[in-house]
Amino acid sequence: MLTTTLFRSIASCEINAWQDMYSAAGHELSDQFGIKVFSMGSACISLVKNIDILAFNRVIGLGLFQTATEEMVDNIISKYKNAGIKRFFIQIHPEAAPPQLKDWFAQRNIVHYNNWVKHYRGVENPPVVETELEIREVKSKDDVDRFGEIITLSFEWPDEMRLWFEHLVGRKCWKTYLALDGDRAVAAASMYVKDDCGWLSFASTLPDYRGKGAQTALIARRIQDAAELGCKVLTVETAEDNEEKRSQSLQNIQKMGFEVAFVRPNFLWKAE
């Protein structure tokens, strides 16, 4: 059951992971991409000026642990405007306060765009997945290069971003993985672990290997590793699965025992 304590744990874990992800970029990449991260109340505000990808230009945690104000909303908009960013997301948790948040958004032309679904599960009874693929942690220089390459290719993100993801390899609190078919790396994934919570992220598979079980094998490995690290709960987020747009990621994680924690709406601001 998703208790208040558990809800706060998985929400905090995600915020901590994203903050550390941006710190991992380092000064050179931060200057190259225009990366900045701010805290405002309980919100984590991330800006990547030179990469127009909503996943990296977004606000999470607004009104979650500290009640939001209209001034906060205005200040958030100002930060993105001043950085020259043309659009960004604000993601709202079900427990975000005050209830007037969505009214404040509407008054500022911040509109509902879509929903993402937050899932969770314990680490007990790790699933056993039969696969011919080799699942291993990223350690060698060749593996590091392939890890970043698979993520950027799979998500169709700019190639220069691969260095950013490669900086996660070996970083404190992070575990990074590859799935290989023989000598060919075909899928990648990561996990951020802090205290008793783990955040699964950057699940990516090359197009010609999708639907062949790489991600279920990577999920199983991360559940097993999380248990060994002393985690009690894991969390992951996917797009919604509906008739208009199917979500293979959502189907994969629910098959592996994850339950829905909550549906989180994404609100979009665009420069006029």
Each model region followed by its residue ranges:
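Acyl-donor-binding surface of acyltransferase catalytic domains
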Residues: 67-134, 139, 236-237, 242, ...
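Short amphipathic alpha-helix that is part of the acyltransferase structural core
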Residues: 1-25, 116, 120, 125-161
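Conserved acetyl-CoA binding element of GNAT-fold acetyltransferases
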Residues: 52-64, 196-207, 266
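A conserved beta-strand-loop-helix scaffold within acyl/acetyltransferase catalytic domains
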Residues: 156-208
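A short helix-loop-beta-strand connector motif used in the catalytic cores of GNAT acetyltransferases and
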Residues: 27-38, 86, 113-115, 168-178, ...
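Conserved beta-hairpin
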Residues: 36-41, 100-111, 173-188
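N-terminal charged segments
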Residues: 1-81, 165
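Conserved acetyl-CoA-binding loop-helix of GNAT-fold acetyltransferases
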Residues: 69-77, 202-205, 211-228, 251
